[in-house]
């Protein structure tokens, strides 16, 4: 369709477009899905992706970074702005606050395990549980997850978490 043949736009145009798309999606996606449809996008997933792209756009990697000087589209326009914009951080912070507020309304929160001996937060077990426990096991920190079948279990068991595996945890 000619409408889709827009050519290369600037990074800022793309971020604004994605921001608007995720915001609109958050208005039409459901709060949750039944277990049968687990892993599908929800309102919180859309808001989380929105916050993440806005944080990236505000970061020094692309916000005023001179590394991208000379990256131009076919019309000769700069693809990345060379000017630092502090308002990008404000917009990202507002998106993160909106996500946190919506998540708390839905009963989401940090996964915390208290030490049985002194009642204080156990940072190791809290971190372990946040990354290794499912929602069914009491982890209400999960916003969006990747469902898996029982195929390829040995490969996944031996693959580090950073590469999509479970790093030796059988759960």
Model-derived regions: residue spans:
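Aromatic-anchored glycine-rich loop motif in surface-exposed flexible loops
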Residues: 1-43, 54-83
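TPR/Sel1-like alpha-solenoid repeat signature
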Residues: 47-53
């Amino acid at each position: 369709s000619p409408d889709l043949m827009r050519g290369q736009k600037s990074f800022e145009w793309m971020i604004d477009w994605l921001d608007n798309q995720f915001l609109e999606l958050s208005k039409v996606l459901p709060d949750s899905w039944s277990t049968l449809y687990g892993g599908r996008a929800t309102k919180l997933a859309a808001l989380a992706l929105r916050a993440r792209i806005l944080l990236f756009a505000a970061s020094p990697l692309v916000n005023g970074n001179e590394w991208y000087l000379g990256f131009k589209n076919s019309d000769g326009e700069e693809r990345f702005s060379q000017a630092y914009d502090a308002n990008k951080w404000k917009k990202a912070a507002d998106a993160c606050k909106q996500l946190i507020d919506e998540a708390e309304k839905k009963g989401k929160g940090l996964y915390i395990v208290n030490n049985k001996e002194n009642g204080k937060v156990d940072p190791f077990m809290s971190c372990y549980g946040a990354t290794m426990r499912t929602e069914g096991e009491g982890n209400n920190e999960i916003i969006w997850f990747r469902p898996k079948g029982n195929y390829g279990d040995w490969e996944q068991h031996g693959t580090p978490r950073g590469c999509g595996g479970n790093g030796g945890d059988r759960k």
